[in-house]
Design a protein with these regions (language model features):
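Glutamate identity and glutamate-enriched acidic tracts
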Residues: 9, 28, 49-51, 95, ...
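An internal, acidic/charged active-site-proximal segment
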Residues: 98-190
């Protein structure tokens, strides 16, 4: 059980896929299931020498703190929630990483996890989504931090529809009633 060469992430994902397929067979066919992404703060404020420890922005307190962002992928049918996979993400910016990564063999899973921890949230999210390709869920659900046009387009390429709150910003425009408009203008017309 303590072997670092074993791919525990893949094992957990395979077990959860099997369990989800079992639950899905027992539920009604008209019930929709979703994959849910959540990005939470994993605070490590007292830590000093944790590998890949970074300054991350906490959206609830609107401050930077030491820790990681924990990207979690889960499955739900409306009554049941099952976690499928998660990744601890450091920062993509070198100046925000407080402790560097140890030197490890590039052929190992440990190296791949360290590289993945420094990738963008969107890239890691798509990697997790591709890993869940066998899980029956038509929709991907996430909050407004992910609901950007680039993210929606990339999720659609994975043959999943998106449910999410649109981020209110002046910079992004959507086509509504034949015109390109920002979200505030669309809300005023509804």
């Amino acid at each position: 059980l303590n072997d670092s060469r074993f791919n525990w992430e893949k094992l957990v994902r395979m077990i959860m896929t099997h369990l989800i397929l079992l639950i899905d067979r027992l539920t009604e066919k008209n019930r929709q299931s979703v994959l849910i992404f959540d990005d939470s703060l994993f605070s490590r404020n007292r830590s000093k020498k944790v590998e890949l420890l970074a300054k991350v922005f906490d959206h609830t307190s609107h401050k930077f703190c030491k820790g990681f962002r924990m990207l979690t992928l889960g499955w739900s049918d409306g009554n049941t929630f099952l976690p499928i996979s998660f990744n601890l993400l450091s920062s993509t910016k070198d100046e925000n990483v407080l402790c560097g990564a140890k030197t490890v063999d590039k052929r190992t899973l440990a190296y791949k996890r360290r590289v993945q921890a420094r990738q963008s949230t969107l890239d890691v999210m798509l990697t997790l989504l591709r890993g869940a390709k066998d899980i029956p869920a038509k929709f991907v659900l996430f909050d407004s931090w992910f609901t950007m046009p680039k993210t929606v387009v990339r999720v659609k390429k994975e043959n999943r529809d998106v449910i999410g709150m649109i981020r209110i910003t002046e910079k992004i425009h959507y086509q509504y009633q034949g015109q390109w408009q920002n979200v505030k203008d669309i809300y005023q017309k509804i």
